[in-house]
Amino acid sequence: DIPGKSIGVAVSDFPLGPFVDARGSALITNDMTVERTKIYWDDIDPTVFIDDDGQAYLYWGNTQCYYAKLKSNMIELDGPIVHVDLPRFTEAPWIHKRGDWYYLSYASEFPEKICYAMSRSITGPWEYKGILNEIAGNSNTNHQAIIEFKGDWYFVYHNGGINPTGGSYRRSVCIDRLYYNEDGTMKRIQMTTEGVQ
């Protein structure tokens, strides 16, 4: 009965499901984040990162970025909700780690670009590093994931390329290579129509 967007948790014994509600209630509700914004849709786009010590963190948000530790059961918060101050944050936070660096990428402004920040700690402070990916074709939104596979890094995102005559909220999944500079910063993504081989 709480108005606004919420974040729930579903579980399954298999990656393809079936999934069931793990709690019987939302993990995050809009009334838990009203001190930062009065909008009702700020509690969206969750991502979970499990650090090297096994501690899990939930990051999420729209117009405001938040994180909280998760208990080992992964269905309860373990401490307060913390606000993360990022320039021009819109939504879709994603956390990954490479070496000693943590990377927090996110959708910025509208139409959305992907920006990122770096830190030596999963809890910050975060240093803004700029744009990672420009506006994707025929898509006002642009969300991302960054993964390592067999020693190479990949940038997964979406555009509206499959149906360019449709609306700007249609999403086509894309994947391109991601490269790092010697100082650990990420090189801007070169969006391709071919993807990866």
Annotate the PLM regions.
Residues 1-197:
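Carbohydrate-active catalytic/glycan-binding domains of CAZyme proteins
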